[in-house]
Amino acid sequence: MSGTNQSSVSEFLLLGLSRQPQQQHLLFVFFLSMYLATVLGNLLIILSVSIDSCLHTPMYFFLSNLSFVDICFSFTTVPKMLANHILETQTISFCGCLTQMYFVFMFVDMDNFLLAVMAYDHFVAVCHPLHYTAKMTHQLCALLVAGLWVVANLNVLLHTLLMAPLSFCADNAITHFFCDVTPLLKLSCSDTHLNEVIILSEGALVMITPFLCILASYMHITCTVLKVPSTKGRWKAFSTCGSHLAVVLLFYSTIIAVYFNPLSSHSAEKDTMATVLYTVVTPMLNPFIYSLRNRYLKGALKKVVGRVVFSV
């Protein structure tokens, strides 16, 4: 096997979610609708935060960054799948496959890191309100986001460099709608033990550390809120964090289901469904979840929509 040249497979076939023509047409409309909703919803969040001076706070700064990442995340996978349907092709080059995998992993990491930073921001706001402006300065927030981009790129570069030398000998059909690491490892005729170990160890460290930070933040928040004598005050604090918790649970449950199980136990159908949740559904739902119970954000969104309507 070691002597097999990886160039024997120069491109892959992305089989998508269904091979039935009628289902493919329905899926095309479904994913196009979700993609447009994702871009529009997250773009409205970014515009609202940038236009309304009342939202120029660390919490909304991180939220606008999360919206930007979600737009990029969705752009990495969905347009290629839609283009393949229109052009009636399923091929993607080896380099294109690695590039797509790189950006998918990078935006997953950024989502992961930003959710942790947002949890810390909630922790400081609820548990140390008098020191909030001193701790969460604009300079610190900008440095945090810049640092997250650097760490995410370095982490993804490691996985990509480990994937690049693998050999792919005969089968080039990926039972997925984008180039994900798990189906690629299954296709490889090289020894993928090191890749699996790195994904489960280093990958787990990158995912679990922020998750533990989120848990610790919310444990402190819960203890602090329970000491508040006013029921209205408790509800206000919990409602502020509730939307973030909903996004956290949806994101981490699907990530763990897909990546942190032994390769032999993976089911292509289950993996694909879980992947659809965190690559397509979650980025679409985030703007709705965050704005649903947030009157400040809803007010800013109404202003933006009103400006657009009157300008037309």
Curated annotation (Swiss-Prot):
Name recorded for this polypeptide: Olfactory receptor 1F1
Intrachain disulfide bonds: C97-C189
Record's subcellular location: Cell membrane
Native organism: Homo sapiens
Residues modified by glycosylation: N5
UniProt xrefs under PANTHER family: OLFACTORY RECEPTOR
Gene name of the encoded protein: OR1F1
UniProt xrefs under CDD domains: 7tmA_OR1_7-like (cd15918)
Keywords for the protein's UniProt record, in alphabetical order: Cell membrane, Disulfide bond, G-protein coupled receptor, Glycoprotein, Membrane, Olfaction, Receptor, Sensory transduction, Transducer, Transmembrane, Transmembrane helix
